[in-house]
A protein has these predicted regions:
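Gly/Pro/Ser/Thr-rich low-complexity, intrinsically disordered segments predominantly at protein N-termini
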Residues: 1-201
Length: 201
């Protein structure tokens, strides 16, 4: 019988003594558990999402994949430099549960810093968790709009599963459509139909 390898000690983070730029944040790398985001130069740590949450994001990606135009691609759980601060100043980076980005950005993300830029992203998607409702519906809503991300979808797994589709409305930020349950259908930014109930496993 082969023994399973024992996990090593968790990587210890040095708590920064100053507000971080995007470059400093990217240099921190990944944590052993949970994930981080950067908000006005402050590292915000969150626990790892639940299995149900991650499965819903994965199932959403599976439904989207065959419906995306060839120039678009989806990615789960990756940092986005929101570009809300000049280089060298305290930065903003969020990690949407799923994003739809222009395929041409993938090579740069893979080769360079592993981080999308807000201008690469067409749709940011957050799956609401019990501890993230206000952040997803209000804080990220405003940050993604300020960053110029054209579309933001908020998926709430509270039954019945719902999706709120937000789109840029000029100087007013996002305009939010009414929450949809059952099947979400739209023609913008591309024709898509999503069975929301199928996001529950």
């Amino acid at each position: 019988m082969t023994a399973l390898p024992q996990p090593g000690p968790a990587r210890r983070w040095e708590i920064p003594d100053h507000l971080l730029t995007i470059e400093e944040y990217a240099a921190l790398g990944e944590t052993e558990t949970g994930f981080t985001e950067l908000v006005e130069g402050r590292v915000v740590m969150s626990p790892s999402p639940s299995r149900r949450h991650n499965k819903a994001a994965y199932l959403l990606g599976r439904q989207l994949e065959s419906q995306l135009p060839p120039e678009l691609d989806f990615t789960l759980d990756i940092d986005v430099d929101l570009g809300l601060a000049p280089r060298g100043e305290a930065g903003f980076s969020r990690r949407p549960d799923l994003l739809i980005a222009y395929r041409e950005a993938n090579a740069r993300v893979d080769d360079e810093d592993g981080m999308y830029r807000a201008g690469d992203v067409l749709v940011a998607v957050e799956v609401v968790s019990p501890g993230s409702k206000r952040t997803d519906y209000q804080v990220k809503h405003d940050e993604y709009a300020d960053a110029g991300i054209p579309y933001y979808w908020i998926v709430d797994l509270t039954e019945p599963v719902s999706l709120v589709a937000c789109h840029q409305a000029g100087e007013f930020g996002y305009m939010d459509a009414a929450a949809v349950t059952g099947t979400f259908t739209t023609d913008v930014p591309f024709p898509v139909e999503i069975d929301l109930d199928a996001l529950l496993d």
